[in-house]
A protein has these predicted regions:
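Catalytic-core signature of thiol
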Residues: 1-204
C-alpha cells in the first residue's frame, strides 16, 4: 500500500478510494507499487463532480479509455481544475476494464474480495462517532448510520475482542484515526457505517 494520503478541503474522497484500489490491484498483479494521480480524476472524470463529490465506479469507467497518470506527473491541488491529461505521460501499460461490483450487504462476499485486493467502499462519515475514532473496532451501526457520504478503501479483514471488522484506509491524513486507518464492524446486514453497502474495484 502507498502511505495514507490527505484529501484536504476538497470532497475528492472518491478519487483516493479509486487510486488506492488500483494501486493495490496493480501491485498484486505486477509487484510494482505506484502512486496514481487523484487530481487527474478530480479534473477529468466527467461522470463525477471533482471536489463536489463522486464515486469510485466513475473513475473505473474513466480508466477504461484513459491510462492512469502518476501523482508526480499530475500532483494534487485539493481544488477543481482544467483537465490536463497527457497520454504520453501516463502508465499506458495499465488497462482497466471497468468497475467490478461485489455483492452488496454481504459480509462474506466483501471479506473474500478484500482477501484478493483492496476494495473501494462507501460509508457514512459525518457522525462524531466516526470522526472522533482513535482505536479499536467501531461496532455501533446505529450511531454511525448508513447515509453514504464518503468513499474509503477496505484493505483487510480481521477480528478483535470477538468483533469481526474491515480495516479501512481513509484519506484524512495519517494524523486521523489510528494512523489514518479505522476498523469498521462487519455484520450480516449493511456493516457499520454502511461499509458493506456499495463495494467495487477496478478490473485489470
Amino acid at each position: 500500500m502507498t502511505p495514507v494520503k490527505d484529501q484536504g478541503h476538497c470532497g475528492s474522497c472518491w478519487t483516493f478510494a479509486s487510486t488506492g484500489a488500483l494501486e493495490g490491484a496493480w501491485f498484486i498483479k505486477s509487484g510494482e507499487l505506484l502512486s496514481f494521480s487523484e487530481q487527474e480524476l478530480v479534473d477529468c472524470v466527467n461522470l463525477s463532480f471533482g471536489c463536489n463529490g463522486g464515486n469510485a465506479a466513475a473513475s473505473f469507467h474513466y480508466w477504461k479509455t484513459h491510462f492512469p497518470m502518476s501523482e508526480a506527473s499530475y500532483p494534487y491541488t485539493a481544488k477543481n481544475g482544467a483537465c490536463v491529461y497527457n497520454a504520453n505521460d501516463s502508465y499506458n501499460n495499465i488497462q482497466v476494464t471497468g468497475p467490478v461490483g461485489v455483492t452488496h450487504n454481504d459480509k462474506v462476499a466483501l471479506q473474500n474480495a478484500v482477501y484478493q485486493q483492496p476494495i473501494a467502499v462507501a460509508i457514512e462519515a459525518d457522525t462524531m462517532y466516526f470522526q472522533t475514532y482513535t482505536s479499536g473496532v467501531l461496532t455501533d451501526a446505529v450511531a454511525c448510520g448508513t447515509n453514504l457520504d464518503h468513499a474509503v478503501l477496505a484493505v483487510g479483514f480481521g477480528q478483535e475482542n470477538g468483533n469481526d471488522y474491515f480495516l479501512i484506509k481513509n484519506s484524512w491524513s495519517a494524523d486521523w484515526g489510528d494512523q489514518g486507518y479505522v476498523k469498521l464492524g462487519a455484520d450480516n446486514n449493511n456493516g457499520v457505517c454502511g461499509v458493506q453497502m456499495d463495494p467495487n474495484y477496478p478490473g485489470l
